[in-house]
């Protein structure tokens, strides 16, 4: 994920998926000059990331942690003051996107849905699907269309199958996209 300053944040899950023994992952920072350094560790299957429009906060989906985690971003791109942005009891956040009201949409594969939450975890809206939701992004002409990437998910073994069940679905969202990755 590239922020408004040109910094790229890259995460790794920390173990071989599927089938490997769980181990926490990391977030690495790649600066515009090509320097690379680790800026966070101990994250539980890190997935989607967003940065607020002011480039002050990075929010990470921790799929195995059932939460969205926030970090303050320093001027040099370092991450500090780790905290839970939203505890998603029973939710497994995958891809995420941020809207102009400060809410986050998260894709949830095993629960076959895309959910909009505010900081603290209050659920604002749920879009139930008939298959797993892997990614979401706000875009379109007015940046107010929520696009959802969904496919049938029968566990890790289904990744090697010949099924062709993927769809891109969309709805009109209550607020336009904001922050990074760029939605426009």
Model region roles, listed by residue range:
Residues 1-8, 24-26, 36-57, 87-103, ...:
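Beta-rich, blade/repeat-based domains predominating
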Residues 2, 8-19, 58-64, 104-109, ...:
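Conserved beta-strand positions in repeat-built beta-propeller and related beta-rich domains
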Residues 18-19, 68, 114, 156-157:
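Glycine/Thr-rich phosphate-binding loops of Rossmann-like dinucleotide-binding domains
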Residues 25-28, 67-69, 113-115, 167-169:
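A short loop-to-beta-strand structural motif that recurs across blades of beta-propeller domains
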Residues 30-37, 75-83, 121-125, 176-182:
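Beta-strand initiation motifs
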Residues 66-73, 78-82, 86-122:
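Loop/turn-rich, solvent-exposed surfaces of beta-rich toroidal or solenoidal domains
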Residues 106-107, 115-116, 124-127, 135-137, ...:
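Conserved active-site loop/cleft motifs that coordinate metal ions or position small ligands
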Residues 137-184:
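Blade-level signature of beta-propeller repeat domains, shared across WD40, Kelch, NHL, RCC1
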